[in-house]
Amino acid sequence: MIIILKGGRVIDPRNRRDEDADIWMEDGQIIAPQETVPEDAKIYDLAGKWVVPGLIDMHVHLRDPGEEYKESIVTGTDAAAAGGFTAVACMPNTDPVNDTGSVTRYILEKSEGAAARVYPVGALSEGLKGESLAEYADMKHAGAVALTDDGNPVVSSQLMRRAMEYAKSHDMLVISHSEEPTLSKRGCMNEGLVATRLGLKGIPAVAESIMVQREIALAGLTGARLHIAHVSCIESLAAIRDAKKRGLPVTAETAPHYFSLTDDAVIGYDTHAKMNPPLRTEEHRQAIRQALADGTLDVIATDHAPHSIVEKEVTFEYAANGIVGLETSLGLSLALVRDGVLTPSRLVELMSSVPAQILSVAGGELGVGAIADVTVIDPELEHTFLIAEGRSRGANSPFDGWKLKGAATLTFVAGEESYCR
């Protein structure tokens, strides 16, 4: 059956389109509009809506296998579809760790029929221990799209060098969790005035940036493709900007909480505002916003990290790091468009086109013959995010009760409706 998305604003930066137009879909692909509309065609009237390539979140923790009490592939992809995402890349810090082809295959088999596509990311080191390399060829053959020890830094520079060399030989992307652990040890929020007032041990921005600089140096040495995860500070941005000027194969992401919140959110010892890297000051927040606009940062990803209530309802120092983000990312990111920081086309690049290119996966465009992964957005829809009504099992969000403007109203995966608001 032909599906017609009629009269929406089609924003497709890869094909340089930003115009009111119709999108036709059939058999899981985008097709060229026909002269006559078939009688059995399903038509959606989307006047006033944006029609964009399906959003892709390249940094998600689905917690499956092993920690399904926090999240599962089913609940995580349900939350993704509700947030407008047609695909997610899931991190390997599961139980067991995704460091073999068998775990990669389990994830892909369990994700069949899910509300969004799932792209497994394999571990850089066995067990995420940073001691020996994992089986890259085995994981790639099974379907892994990239490699990372996310959640843990690779402390050994020698091991990271070998990891990049091995990854390059298999044409695999390396994603870095950039953290110098001797500088961040026992820290639980940004080092600064707020931490001093609260009596909490801080984590300096240099704990992130010094490792970003190391990773960039090793990428230059090895020629490996490097992606810096969850960038939070000015110093990291400077290093990334310089790497790009030198033509190194380096890309980077940030998350909505880093351009929406500051470390003031921790006042009151709110554990829902605890994540790693931590929220920084207003100066860093503004720099992140500018870096999204000028191309220093390539991707908006959520770092969706669900936890159970008991893991957050403890004293701040002992609370788990991370927040859920799949259902708030789009609304928070659209604020950058309203503020004049981003154009709608640039936002689609950051949340769809560029993630697809970095991960070397299908999607990120609406050209004829492309997969029919499509997100429909109502940029004017005002709504209040309530964590109790969310689809994720995680209840850890500092945005609970926030009034947001703009949301996904329809999500299509391979031409099939996976979410309707």
Curated annotation (Swiss-Prot):
PROSITE patterns reported in the protein's UniProt record: DIHYDROOROTASE_1, DIHYDROOROTASE_2
Record GO terms (molecular function): allantoinase activity; dihydroorotase activity; zinc ion binding
Any one of the GO BP annotations: 'de novo' UMP biosynthetic process
Pathway(s) where this gene product acts: Pyrimidine metabolism; UMP biosynthesis via de novo pathway; (S)-dihydroorotate from bicarbonate: step 3/3
Entry keyword set: Hydrolase, Metal-binding, Pyrimidine biosynthesis, Zinc
Binding of substrate, residues: H61, L62, R63, N93, N276, H307
Transmembrane segments: none
Pfam families in the record: Amidohydro_1
InterPro entries on file: Amidohydro-rel, DHOase, DHOase/Allantoinase_Hydrolase, Dihydroorotase_CS, Metal-dep_hydrolase_composite, Metal_Hydrolase
Residues the record lists as binding Zn(2+) 1: H59, H61, D150, D303
Residues the record lists as binding Zn(2+) 2: D150, H177, H230
Cofactor(s) the protein needs: Zn(2+)
Active site per UniProt: D303
A single Gene Ontology CC term: cytoplasm
Alphabetized CDD domains for the sequence: DHOase_IIa
PANTHER family: ALLANTOINASE
Xref: HAMAP family: PyrC_classI_B (MF_00220_B)
Its biological purpose: Catalyzes the reversible cyclization of carbamoyl aspartate to dihydroorotate.
Similarity comment: family membership: Belongs to the metallo-dependent hydrolases superfamily. DHOase family. Class I DHOase subfamily.
Protein name from the UniProt record: Dihydroorotase
Organism of provenance: Desulfotalea psychrophila (strain LSv54 / DSM 12343)
Gene, per the UniProt record: pyrC
